[in-house]
């Protein structure tokens, strides 16, 4: 596990160990992970995460090029999943004061609800 303090890192470790069954796994590779994840703000959501603990996009370095490229592959798979299932999607990525989970992750959603 990359970071014991990070909820996303702990979740990825449990899923990889087969101890936490998420919704359907959409993409799983050395660097990225995407799964169908219920969310109170959307009828349908796929969470796309880096497996390496990187808190924000501002923490990316040139050494993370492979992670970024693979994250885009995971994002493509998640997007196609929602195109096939719902016909469309929105992509959300929070940073700064809007980022509750300090681990790079992208929400690929169908119809985001207003609070």
What do these predicted ranges mean?
Residues 1-115:
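HIT superfamily nucleotide-processing domains
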């Amino acid at each position: 596990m990359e970071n014991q303090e990070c909820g996303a890192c702990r979740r990825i470790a449990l899923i990889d160990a087969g101890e936490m069954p998420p919704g359907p796994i959409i993409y799983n590779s050395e660097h990225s992970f995407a799964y169908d994840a219920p969310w109170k703000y959307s009828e349908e959501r796929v969470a796309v995460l880096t497996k390496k603990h990187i808190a924000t996009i501002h923490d990316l370095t040139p050494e993370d090029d492979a992670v970024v490229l693979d994250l885009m592959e995971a994002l493509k798979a998640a997007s196609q999943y929602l195109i096939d299932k719902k016909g469309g999607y929105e992509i959300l990525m929070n940073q700064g004061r809007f980022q509750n989970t300090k681990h790079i992750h992208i929400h690929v959603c169908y119809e985001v609800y207003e609070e």
